[in-house]
């Protein structure tokens, strides 16, 4: 499954990543690469937990749009 992720850099210099389609699924890393590796693991664990509890796995219906202002 593919999921849209949002990655931002916090005031301490860490990259924070979250998955809008999976509430509460987020992680961080010292580098973008580390943060993206971590979010893949977090997504797998999140989905595994949903399956274990016989819960529906959300589909990603996000649309990516960049707006320049």
From Swiss-Prot:
InterPro entries: HicB-like, TA_system_antitoxin, TTHA1013/TTHA0281-like. Pfam families: HicB_lk_antitox (PF15919). Belongs to the UPF0150 family. This is UPF0150 protein Ta0767. It comes from Thermoplasma acidophilum (strain ATCC 25905 / DSM 1728 / JCM 9062 / NBRC 15155 / AMRC-C165). The lineage of its organism: Archaea, Methanobacteriati, Thermoplasmatota, Thermoplasmata, Thermoplasmatales.
């Amino acid at each position: 499954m593919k999921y849209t992720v949002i990655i931002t850099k916090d005031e301490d210099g860490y990259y924070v990543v979250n998955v809008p389609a999976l509430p509460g699924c987020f992680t961080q890393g010292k580098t973008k690469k580390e943060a993206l590796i971590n979010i893949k693991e977090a997504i797998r664990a999140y989905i595994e937990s949903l399956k274990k509890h016989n819960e529906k796995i959300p589909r990603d219906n996000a649309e990516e749009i960049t707006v320049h202002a």
